[in-house]
Regions:
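Conserved catalytic/switch belt of AAA+ P-loop NTPases
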Residues: 102-105, 128-145
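AAA+ P-loop NTPase domains with strong preference for DNA replication initiators
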Residues: 172-181
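Hydrophobic residues in beta-strands of the RecA-like P-loop NTPase core, especially within AAA+ ATPase
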Residues: 27, 116, 130-131, 147
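P-loop/Walker A NTP-binding region and its immediately flanking N-terminal helices
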Residues: 1-119, 142
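A generic "binding-loop/recognition-motif" signal
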Residues: 118, 149, 170
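Conserved AAA+ ATPase "SRH/arginine-finger" region at the nucleotide-binding site
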Residues: 78, 163-173
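Short regulatory helix/loop adjacent to the ATP-binding pocket of P-loop NTPases
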Residues: 125, 129-134, 149-162, 179
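Conserved TIR/SEFIR loop-to-helix hotspot centered on a Trp-containing motif
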Residues: 122
Length: 181
Protein backbone atom coordinates (compact mmCIF):
# COMPACT_ATOMS: atom_id res chain seq x y z
CA UNK A 1 0.00 0.00 0.00
CA UNK A 2 1.38 3.39 -0.93
CA UNK A 3 0.52 6.96 -0.13
CA UNK A 4 -1.69 9.18 -2.22
CA UNK A 5 0.30 11.86 -4.08
CA UNK A 6 -0.98 14.66 -1.82
CA UNK A 7 0.29 12.80 1.24
CA UNK A 8 3.93 12.53 0.21
CA UNK A 9 5.09 15.87 1.63
CA UNK A 10 3.28 15.17 4.90
CA UNK A 11 4.96 11.75 5.06
CA UNK A 12 8.37 13.44 5.01
CA UNK A 13 7.28 15.59 7.95
CA UNK A 14 6.00 12.62 9.94
CA UNK A 15 8.77 10.23 8.82
CA UNK A 16 9.12 7.89 11.78
CA UNK A 17 12.76 7.06 11.09
CA UNK A 18 13.85 10.70 11.16
CA UNK A 19 13.12 11.14 14.84
CA UNK A 20 12.74 9.31 18.09
CA UNK A 21 9.43 7.49 18.04
CA UNK A 22 6.63 8.73 20.24
CA UNK A 23 4.45 6.07 21.88
CA UNK A 24 1.18 7.50 20.50
CA UNK A 25 0.20 9.41 17.38
CA UNK A 26 -3.12 11.11 16.69
CA UNK A 27 -3.68 11.55 12.95
CA UNK A 28 -6.45 13.98 12.09
CA UNK A 29 -8.08 14.42 8.71
CA UNK A 30 -11.42 14.66 6.94
CA UNK A 31 -13.38 11.72 5.62
CA UNK A 32 -12.34 10.79 2.10
CA UNK A 33 -8.86 12.34 2.23
CA UNK A 34 -7.04 9.03 2.66
CA UNK A 35 -6.48 9.17 6.42
CA UNK A 36 -6.90 5.42 6.91
CA UNK A 37 -4.44 4.70 4.09
CA UNK A 38 -1.94 7.15 5.60
CA UNK A 39 -2.32 5.46 9.01
CA UNK A 40 -1.87 2.00 7.46
CA UNK A 41 1.31 3.08 5.65
CA UNK A 42 2.58 4.50 8.94
CA UNK A 43 1.78 1.28 10.84
CA UNK A 44 3.45 -0.81 8.13
CA UNK A 45 6.58 1.33 8.24
CA UNK A 46 6.88 0.74 11.98
CA UNK A 47 6.80 -3.03 11.49
CA UNK A 48 8.84 -3.51 8.29
CA UNK A 49 12.56 -4.02 8.88
CA UNK A 50 13.61 -3.22 5.27
CA UNK A 51 12.25 0.26 4.65
CA UNK A 52 12.55 1.83 1.21
CA UNK A 53 14.60 4.98 0.62
CA UNK A 54 11.33 6.84 1.10
CA UNK A 55 11.03 5.22 4.57
CA UNK A 56 7.96 3.17 3.70
CA UNK A 57 7.46 -0.57 4.08
CA UNK A 58 9.30 -2.53 1.38
CA UNK A 59 6.33 -4.75 0.51
CA UNK A 60 8.60 -7.77 0.01
CA UNK A 61 9.95 -8.99 3.35
CA UNK A 62 8.25 -11.56 5.58
CA UNK A 63 6.74 -8.81 7.76
CA UNK A 64 5.25 -7.08 4.72
CA UNK A 65 3.84 -10.36 3.43
CA UNK A 66 2.10 -10.84 6.78
CA UNK A 67 0.87 -7.24 6.71
CA UNK A 68 -1.00 -8.02 3.50
CA UNK A 69 -3.10 -10.52 5.45
CA UNK A 70 -2.81 -10.35 9.22
CA UNK A 71 0.44 -9.54 11.02
CA UNK A 72 0.88 -10.89 14.56
CA UNK A 73 2.38 -7.56 15.70
CA UNK A 74 -0.42 -5.36 14.35
CA UNK A 75 -3.84 -4.94 15.90
CA UNK A 76 -6.43 -2.84 14.07
CA UNK A 77 -9.51 -1.60 15.91
CA UNK A 78 -12.28 0.19 14.07
CA UNK A 79 -15.94 1.04 14.40
CA UNK A 80 -16.66 -0.56 11.02
CA UNK A 81 -18.88 -3.51 11.77
CA UNK A 82 -21.55 -5.78 10.41
CA UNK A 83 -24.82 -4.11 9.48
CA UNK A 84 -27.01 -3.67 12.53
CA UNK A 85 -24.09 -3.96 14.96
CA UNK A 86 -22.89 -1.14 17.19
CA UNK A 87 -20.95 1.63 15.49
CA UNK A 88 -19.08 2.44 18.70
CA UNK A 89 -15.71 1.08 19.74
CA UNK A 90 -16.32 -0.86 22.93
CA UNK A 91 -14.36 -0.97 26.15
CA UNK A 92 -13.72 -4.66 25.49
CA UNK A 93 -11.91 -3.80 22.24
CA UNK A 94 -9.68 -1.39 24.14
CA UNK A 95 -9.07 -3.82 27.00
CA UNK A 96 -7.85 -6.33 24.43
CA UNK A 97 -4.95 -3.96 23.68
CA UNK A 98 -3.36 -4.87 27.02
CA UNK A 99 -3.60 -8.58 26.19
CA UNK A 100 -2.18 -7.94 22.72
CA UNK A 101 0.91 -6.03 23.90
CA UNK A 102 1.59 -8.60 26.62
CA UNK A 103 2.05 -11.29 23.96
CA UNK A 104 5.66 -11.57 22.90
CA UNK A 105 6.60 -10.15 19.54
CA UNK A 106 7.11 -12.65 16.73
CA UNK A 107 10.67 -11.30 16.33
CA UNK A 108 13.34 -10.13 18.75
CA UNK A 109 12.97 -6.41 19.31
CA UNK A 110 9.86 -6.31 17.14
CA UNK A 111 7.39 -3.50 17.61
CA UNK A 112 3.75 -4.00 18.53
CA UNK A 113 1.52 -1.53 16.70
CA UNK A 114 -2.09 -0.77 17.54
CA UNK A 115 -4.08 1.19 14.97
CA UNK A 116 -7.41 2.56 16.17
CA UNK A 117 -9.48 4.19 13.44
CA UNK A 118 -12.22 6.72 14.18
CA UNK A 119 -11.43 7.16 17.86
CA UNK A 120 -14.23 9.67 18.16
CA UNK A 121 -16.50 6.60 18.17
CA UNK A 122 -15.05 5.31 21.45
CA UNK A 123 -17.62 4.87 24.20
CA UNK A 124 -16.91 6.92 27.33
CA UNK A 125 -15.68 3.81 29.13
CA UNK A 126 -13.51 2.83 26.16
CA UNK A 127 -11.98 6.32 26.06
CA UNK A 128 -11.09 6.06 29.74
CA UNK A 129 -9.58 2.59 29.19
CA UNK A 130 -7.54 3.94 26.26
CA UNK A 131 -6.24 6.70 28.50
CA UNK A 132 -4.75 4.04 30.78
CA UNK A 133 -2.82 2.61 27.79
CA UNK A 134 -1.60 6.09 26.88
CA UNK A 135 -0.46 6.85 30.43
CA UNK A 136 1.47 3.59 30.84
CA UNK A 137 2.69 2.59 27.37
CA UNK A 138 4.45 -0.77 27.22
CA UNK A 139 7.95 -0.76 25.78
CA UNK A 140 8.17 -1.22 22.00
CA UNK A 141 4.45 -0.67 21.48
CA UNK A 142 2.97 2.18 19.49
CA UNK A 143 -0.55 3.53 19.18
CA UNK A 144 -1.74 5.18 15.99
CA UNK A 145 -5.13 6.83 16.39
CA UNK A 146 -7.19 8.41 13.63
CA UNK A 147 -9.97 10.96 13.97
CA UNK A 148 -11.90 13.27 11.71
CA UNK A 149 -12.61 15.73 14.49
CA UNK A 150 -10.97 16.06 17.89
CA UNK A 151 -13.69 18.14 19.53
CA UNK A 152 -15.36 15.05 21.03
CA UNK A 153 -12.12 13.53 22.35
CA UNK A 154 -11.00 13.70 25.95
CA UNK A 155 -8.38 16.47 26.30
CA UNK A 156 -6.22 14.02 28.25
CA UNK A 157 -6.12 11.66 25.25
CA UNK A 158 -5.12 14.51 22.94
CA UNK A 159 -2.41 15.72 25.32
CA UNK A 160 -0.72 12.31 25.44
CA UNK A 161 -0.42 11.93 21.68
CA UNK A 162 1.79 13.51 19.09
CA UNK A 163 -0.82 15.20 16.93
CA UNK A 164 -0.47 15.26 13.16
CA UNK A 165 -2.88 16.84 10.70
CA UNK A 166 -3.08 14.69 7.58
CA UNK A 167 -3.26 16.57 4.29
CA UNK A 168 -6.39 17.09 2.26
CA UNK A 169 -6.09 16.96 -1.52
CA UNK A 170 -6.75 20.08 -3.52
CA UNK A 171 -9.43 19.81 -6.19
CA UNK A 172 -6.67 19.65 -8.85
CA UNK A 173 -4.81 16.88 -6.98
CA UNK A 174 -8.00 14.85 -6.64
CA UNK A 175 -8.87 15.29 -10.34
CA UNK A 176 -5.35 14.34 -11.45
CA UNK A 177 -5.37 11.27 -9.25
CA UNK A 178 -8.77 10.11 -10.48
CA UNK A 179 -7.79 10.61 -14.12
CA UNK A 180 -4.62 8.56 -13.60
CA UNK A 181 -6.59 5.74 -11.99
Amino acid sequence: MSLYPWQEKAWLELNPSARKLHHAYLLIGPLGAGLVRFANVFASSLICKNLTDYKQACGKCQDCQWLSTEHPNLKVISNESEEGASKNISIESIRNIKKFVELSSHSIGGKKVILINNIESLTVNAANALLKNLEEPPENSYLILTAQNISSLLPTIISRCLMFKAPTPSADDARSFLKAE
